[in-house]
Amino acid sequence: MKLSVVLALFIIFQLGAASLMRNWMFDFEKELEHDYDDSEIGFHNIHSLMARSRRGDKVKICGTKVLKMVMVMCGGECSSTNENIATECCEKMCTMEDITTKCCPSR
């Protein structure tokens, strides 16, 4: 007899707790913003998920790759003699704009 009363109280307690938990979760999910549309924030979130090496437009190129990039960008060899573009782009990262301003400023 005592066992059945304890079992009935336990079942009632479990049903009440489950009902409260379900209501709490429903209220919590209702407070979340599902239709949040901000393209700038979304871009930054996607941007931060990308690998660090792919985030910027600067690239690290060394050796003959620099010569090929200069040939493509300038249509010939680097006209600037005071800067070593190959060493600079290998040690530090360069953008395409850096290559064009340093090697062929007339372009």
From Swiss-Prot:
What sections of the sequence does the record tag as coiled-coil?
none
User: For this UniProt entry, what's an example GO CC term?
Assistant: extracellular region
Propeptide residue span(s): 20-55
Q: Which domain of life is it from?
A: Eukaryota
Q: Give a yes or no for keyword Secreted in this entry.
A: yes
Q: Which GO terms describe its molecular function?
A: hormone activity
Family (UniProt): Belongs to the insulin family.
Instruction: Name the cystine pairs.
Output: 62-90, 74-103, 78-104, 89-94
The protein's matches in PROSITE patterns, at most eight in alphabetical order, are given as:
INSULIN
| Family matches, as Gene3D superfamilies | Insulin-like (1.10.100.10)
Q: Name one GO biological process term.
A: negative regulation of dauer entry
Q: Which UniProt keywords apply?
A: Cleavage on pair of basic residues, Disulfide bond, Secreted, Signal
Principal localization? secreted
May I ask which residue range the UniProt record assigns to the signal sequence?
Answer: 1-19
SUPFAM superfamilies with a match to the protein in the record: Insulin-like
Which cellular compartments is it found in?
Answer: Secreted
Under what name is this protein listed? Probable insulin-like peptide beta-type 3
